[in-house]
Design a protein with these regions (language model features):
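Short beta-strand-to-loop acidic/aromatic patch adjacent to the donor-nucleotide binding site
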Residues: 73-86
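Conserved catalytic core of nucleotide-sugar-dependent glycosyltransferases
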Residues: 68, 86-167
Length: 252
């Protein structure tokens, strides 16, 4: 999946800076993914950050904040590695932010706009070899609900101003809901592109499942936060150690 999404972005948006963060005991991307990506596209605009770690929990919120600190553009896209969108959806989202219509855009529809793709190796090869012809996925895709996961395009300053990603959410569960809620509570202009998103099916560890050990902690934190008004949210985020640390990193 990371081969597909990274190659797709570099191919369709050759001037965009793509930053990828990998946290593992050793780098799989460098030796397994990167050589394949280089067969299809230039990687001059790709930055790969590797962090060696024995941590068993996928700390998505921390990684997203790491990526924000590493970025240097006025607009960023928090992009999951297992999805791609039609090219014009990215362009519509970018234009909405550049023209001031939105502070953040979810560039896919809410409802039944997800194409879940049974992504076998033959389908993978056909999609890349066809220069990303979406019709090659027709026999492998089926409709599933879509809401607010998978990422958003956002003004970098807006992400900082609202407190960035809440690093108290660890592993999977509720962090996307909380971020959307917070953007709305702080009065930011949240836009939407009504279009499809292609989600490539993959194996799941406990980090992507309701049974992960952190799921209830995340759920309980979200149930508490969702009852707060904007003033309470501001007070909470101003007291977070991670937020102070990130603001210091951003000022360096």
């Amino acid at each position: 999946n990371v081969i597909t999404s990274t190659t797709y972005l570099l191919k369709n948006f050759p001037e965009a800076k793509v930053i990828l963060k990998e946290v593992d005991t050793r780098s799989h991307f460098k030796f397994r993914a990167l050589p394949t990506i280089k067969k299809y596209v230039s990687t001059d605009q790709l930055t790969h950050i590797f962090e060696e770690s024995e941590e068993k929990f996928f700390h998505k919120t921390r990684i997203l904040n790491d990526l924000l600190v590493a970025s240097d553009t006025s607009i960023v896209y928090n992009h999951d590695v297992d999805v791609v969108l039609p090219k014009d959806s990215y362009e519509l989202a970018y234009d909405a932010i550049k023209t001031g219509k939105s502070d953040v855009v979810y560039p896919f529809g809410a409802g039944v706009y997800q194409w879940a793709v049974n992504y076998s190796e033959p389908t993978f090869n056909q999609f890349l070899d066809s220069d990303f012809d979406f019709s090659t996925l027709d026999d492998a895709k089926f409709r599933v609900a879509s809401s607010i996961g998978w990422g958003q395009m956002i003004k970098r300053d807006t992400e900082v101003e609202v407190g960035m990603w809440n690093e108290n959410f660890i592993s999977w569960g509720a962090e996307d809901c909380e971020f959307y809620f917070r953007l709305s509570s702080f009065g930011r202009k949240v836009g939407r592109v009504i279009g499809d998103i292609y989600h490539f099916e993959h194996g799941r560890t406990f980090n992507s499942h309701y049974h992960n050990p952190k799921f209830m902690d995340n759920h309980n934190l979200w149930q508490e936060i969702r009852t707060w008004d904007a003033d309470k949210l501001i007070e909470y985020y101003q007291k977070q150690d991670y937020n102070a640390k990130r603001l210091e990193e951003l000022s360096c």
